[in-house]
Structure formats: structure tokens, C-alpha cells
UniProtKB/Swiss-Prot annotation:
Function text: NDH shuttles electrons from NAD(P)H:plastoquinone, via FMN and iron-sulfur (Fe-S) centers, to quinones in the photosynthetic chain and possibly in a chloroplast respiratory chain. The immediate electron acceptor for the enzyme in this species is believed to be plastoquinone. Couples the redox reaction to proton translocation, and thus conserves the redox energy in a proton gradient.
Taxonomic lineage: Eukaryota, Viridiplantae, Streptophyta, Embryophyta, Tracheophyta
Protein name (database record): NAD(P)H-quinone oxidoreductase subunit K, chloroplastic
Catalytic activity, EC: 7.1.1.-
Single GO MF annotation: iron ion binding
Entry binding sites for [4Fe-4S] cluster: 43-44, 108, 139
InterPro entries: NADH_UbQ_OxRdtase-like_20kDa, NADH_UQ_OxRdtase_20Kd_su
Length: 225
């Protein structure tokens, strides 16, 4: 009985067979080709701009800034977002092709920052408008923190399923596609909260005993050091 003889492999050739799935291949191809749309409105964006220099060189991560949302798959929001800017931000996010990601950079973007204490025009968190993948706290965050956030985003991309991500985002849409904001009655009366303002004490609130005690003479030995 003759055995089937297989041709011997050349010892100088290397194995060139890769076993993977289409989803893993798609995730791997997007790890080093994130094209961000830079949405900077205040001082946090200055820290991100330092990444372009030769010291940090964010080109080594495959980041290519784009000016059009139709060519970007990552939007990086840095700074305060106001109510008037909210529809524009949502429109930019809707124009980005799937799959798309969001990094919220800085305290003003995540919570509204110090401007949301008594302001009627500040959005208290960009996640109320668009879904956020990575939160980057700080005021402002350092460039090293931005690189760490990009690394965490790449790890998240490497183990995700695109179909499940698309379905979950469609269920958590904050705005409709038509970008129509519902008109509500304004709760701003033009006056600030009086409890937050400093009010000088009136002379009527000071008791007469306290006033008389302050008028009493001070002994001479207490004036000597």
C-alpha cells in the first residue's frame, strides 16, 4: 500500500498562514488608524495641541487630524460646551461614519466645570448629548494623560463587536436625527441665587452687648508685646 507523499516544506520559508475572524481583523486595522476630529473650545485644547510637537509626536499612534467629520472616526471634545453649541456638536457626531468614538477631555467637558455652578447656558456633561467612550479628567489634563486615554481606547476597540456597538448606540440616542430641540419655558429669571452671594451684616443684627464690649478700654499691659 503506497502512502501519500506530501511535498516537503522549504526550511527557509516562514509560515504565512494566519487564522482569525473578520471582526478581529477589522478591529486590528482600526487600532493604528484613528483619525480624530478636534473639537476644542477652551484651554484643554492647548494641552492637546502640544501632542503635535516632536516631544510627544502623536503621529506614531496613527492619528491624522481631519477637518471634516465625514473622514473622522474619533471626536475629541475639549472645553466647555454651551447650549447654543449643543446642536452643532450633535450634528458633527451624526455626520461621522460608523464605527465612531468619543473622548471627553477635561473637567469642563465631563461635568461642566466651574462654569456650571450658576450658569444657565452650560451643558453639564457632554455625555448628555453624545455617548462617551473614554473620560479624561483634569483641569487641564497633561499630554501624557491624553496618550494614556488613547491607549485605553485602543484596548477597548480591540475587543469589541461592531454590530453590538451600533445597536447599543441606536438605543441610547439623546437627540433625533432631525436635530430639533424642544422649546421649554425659561427658568432663568436674570437674577443669581441670592444664597450664593455675600451679604454684609447689618448693624441691626449686632447686639448692643457686643457693641459695648468693643468700646471698653484695653488695659495697658495687653498693649505691650
Amino acid at each position: 500500500m503506497n502512502l501519500i507523499e506530501f511535498p516537503l516544506l522549504d526550511q527557509t520559508s516562514s509560515n504565512s498562514v494566519i487564522s482569525t475572524t473578520l471582526n478581529d481583523l477589522s478591529n486590528w486595522s482600526r487600532l493604528s488608524s484613528l483619525w480624530p476630529l478636534l473639537y476644542g473650545t477652551s484651554c484643554c485644547f492647548i494641552e492637546f495641541a502640544s501632542l503635535i510637537g516632536s516631544r510627544f509626536d502623536f503621529d506614531r499612534y496613527g492619528l491624522v487630524p481631519r477637518s471634516s467629520p465625514r473622514q473622522a472616526d474619533l471626536i475629541l471634545t475639549a472645553g466647555t460646551v454651551t447650549m447654543k453649541m449643543a446642536p452643532s456638536l450633535v450634528r458633527l457626531y451624526e455626520q461621522m461614519p460608523e464605527p465612531k468614538y468619543v473622548i471627553a477631555m477635561g473637567a469642563c467637558t465631563i461635568t461642566g466645570g466651574m462654569f456650571s455652578t450658576d450658569s444657565y447656558s452650560t451643558v453639564r456633561g457632554v455625555d448628555k448629548l453624545i455617548p462617551v467612550d473614554v473620560y479624561l479628567p483634569g483641569c487641564p489634563p497633561k499630554p501624557e494623560a491624553v496618550i494614556d486615554a488613547l491607549t485605553k481606547l485602543r484596548k477597548k476597540i480591540s475587543r469589541e463587536i461592531v454590530e453590538d456597538r451600533t445597536l447599543s448606540q441606536n438605543k441610547k440616542r439623546c437627540f433625533t436625527t432631525s436635530h430639533k430641540l424642544y422649546v421649554r419655558r425659561s427658568t432663568h429669571t436674570g437674577t443669581y441665587e441670592q444664597e450664593l452671594l455675600y451679604q454684609s451684616p447689618s448693624t441691626l443684627d449686632i447686639s448692643s452687648e457686643t457693641f459695648l464690649k468693643s468700646k471698653s478700654p484695653v488695659p495697658s499691659y495687653k498693649l505691650v508685646n
